[in-house]
Amino acid sequence: EMCIRDSLKGMIALLSEHIYSNPNTFVRELLQNCVDAITALRNIDENYKGRIDVFLNEDKTVVFRDNGVGLKEEEVYRFLTVIGESSKRDTPDADDFIGRFGIGLLSCFVVTNEITVESRSAMGGQPVCWCGKVDGTYQLTLSDEERPIGSQVVLHPKGDWMHLFEYETFKKILVSYGEVLPYPIYLHYQGEEELVNTPSPVWLDPKATRKELLDYGAKVFQSSALDAFRIYTESGKVEGVLYVLPFRTQFSVRNSHKVYLKRMLLSEDDCNLLPPWAFFIRCLVNADGLLSTASRESLVSNDQLKDARKEIGVAIKDYLRGLVQNDRAMFNRILDVHHFHIKAIASEDNELLRLFMDYLPFETNKGLRSFGSIRSASNVICYTTVSYTHLT
């Protein structure tokens, strides 16, 4: 037995139990490895057909298998035996890959004491088998047996986490992370094979109708929306759909969202993609050009994220401007529910203030009236700096 370099048992515990806040993370990390391996091979042959097979066995062992580029013996030594080494970080195609830190495989040690990786490289060489243990030791053997190009990872779950490997629970986790990944994912259970993802989701289809987007959003978020509109940003390459909530929201309440990074689910928070005033918006977006933190649970706060947020803010304002000009009925529906938020937008944008002003409602001594109605009634408008209270 040999020991993983630059690590001790405590280092593995730190990475596997403290960087990753959710025990389900191992599914995401293994799917990410599969996707990146296939992407690496498709960068050589763009017509290559990749697929991912996940086997949930009766003894609750789980196998993740891909037909991607695979690993040679020297690559196993370099990338599996040194914490923090990644085969993807410094390559010319690094932007195509989801992972880049070289620590994701360690998330498996949250749910297992042993990880087995079997691989055959598309670049040649003998098949290899690497078996790593939670105490930091590993064994590496070569095989003369024929095996297909690609890799498979085998996990034997710890007793405390057996419930994650129950069929319905495991399938839900697998779908959550892998639903829109670009390669087909098949779940194998009790001799049956099931496709669990949609490589071409409707919300990434530029030809999707408003109704299709609204129906999909209602299914995903278990809540209807007033309206839906598509966005795309040059900075960060953020693409997807923004939904207008059908109920009034508080500035302090955080709504649920779905943010994907290179089509892998990253977070159900907005990850600071939305402007601070956009509390009436729910986002379903994918970012191909932004960076994740090491835990892959949020986005790195940098100039790219800041610029993407600005572009999304402009897109929301353009959407509202378009409604005023082309769909006054929808604008009025949104205004009825979200006039506080629209006032907040108008207060920081003089152009929108002039555009929206006559439609914005204000409390008066004659009830709630639009500013246009107030202005047309008198040339003199008196106002208070505190909330109006009618005294009887």
Positions of PLM-derived features:
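Residue-level detector of conserved catalytic or cofactor/ligand-binding positions
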Residues: E1-D6, V386, H390-T392
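GHKL (Bergerat-fold) ATPase N-terminal catalytic module, capturing the glycine-rich phosphate-binding loop
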Residues: E1-F165
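GHKL/Bergerat-fold ATPase module in large chromosome/replication-associated machines
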Residues: F97, V117-Q139, K158-H163, E168-L391
